[in-house]
Amino acid sequence: MRVTDFSFELPESLIAHYPQPERSRCRLLSLEGPTGALTHGTFTDLLDKLNPGDLLVFNNTRVIPARLFGRKASGGKIEVLVERMLDDKRILAHIRASKAPKPGTELLLGDDESIHATMTARHGALFEVEFNDPRPVLDILNAIGHMPLPPYIDRPDEDADRELYQTVYSEKPGAVAAPTAGLHFDEPLLAALREKGVEMAFVTLHVGAGTFQPVRVDTIEDHIMHSEYAEVPQEVVDAVLAAKARGNRVIAVGTTSVRSLESAAQAAKRDLIEPFFGDTQIFIYPGYQYKVIDALITNFHLPESTLIMLVSAFAGYQHTMNAYKTAVEQKYRFFSYGDAMFITYNPQAISERP
């Protein structure tokens, strides 16, 4: 399959730079997987679409202020984007500089350049950086870091983004991008869903900066997926198996929840799904056999991205591309701060190719 098969024309004006004032008031495009039928509504329509006993699986990762500015002690400006916190003193990061720093290079970080760090090693495209500071890494990031807004949100981060670019249920710091489907859930909607009898479970996948990396090959099968850390604890496994046993649906909130659950299912030795704690490089594209998910809540994704490929594998290629064409025509808002989709599984998708 060619990467260009997943291209579509998107006017710049449809890229959302700010979220809706009220999280759950965004628009919702529903796609019925088996038929391709589309319906237009608002996000709170989920209350009618979900049944008592259905299981929503959220990603409870919390975005860290992962972008740091500063300079090398020798003078050149640098920008650091944390990919992963290794421990209380060290990070793995992307570094943008006129000349890549060598191991041993001293860095002065923060607007006042008061934080001292050392680049200690290089791992492929990533740099290992150690802070020379008594505080834990997370405290340093909270003090001097900027929220790592995606590259297509063409504005500086603002103080408000520290909360707006978080899900209301975020709990475990470690992501450098928000699991954006979850941004639409507010406390009143969550309470109403619980009241209806909808079950909820939480996985953790710390979204890495690799999520924004373009696919740089022509053929999908040649793409090597970036690695991210995921946790699917026993209570999530129990909730999934219980939902399946009683004939209810497992509904993933976002592609990161999909990748977590499907990683746990792939690694399972005996059951449909078993606990999973570790790095995943799962790459889902047309031809993939879904094992766990019955429905998906997700935002609108970039052309030629691995995420639109994941959606195509779930709903079918033609249904997905037609839904995106309709979304553009109907002026839905795209990407992280944009509108959402509710998609049910298309069992025929596995045999469909572009």
Curated annotation (Swiss-Prot):
It holds the Pfam family Queuosine_synth. It is found in: Cytoplasm. GO terms for biological process: queuosine biosynthetic process; tRNA wobble guanine modification. GO terms for cellular component: cytoplasm. Keywords: Cytoplasm, Queuosine biosynthesis, S-adenosyl-L-methionine, Transferase. The keyword Cytoplasm applies. Its EC number is 2.4.99.17. GO terms for molecular function: S-adenosylmethionine:tRNA ribosyltransferase-isomerase activity. Pathway: tRNA modification; tRNA-queuosine biosynthesis. Monomer. Belongs to the QueA family. Transfers and isomerizes the ribose moiety from AdoMet to the 7-aminomethyl group of 7-deazaguanine (preQ1-tRNA) to give epoxyqueuosine (oQ-tRNA). This is S-adenosylmethionine:tRNA ribosyltransferase-isomerase. It comes from Salmonella agona (strain SL483). The gene is queA.
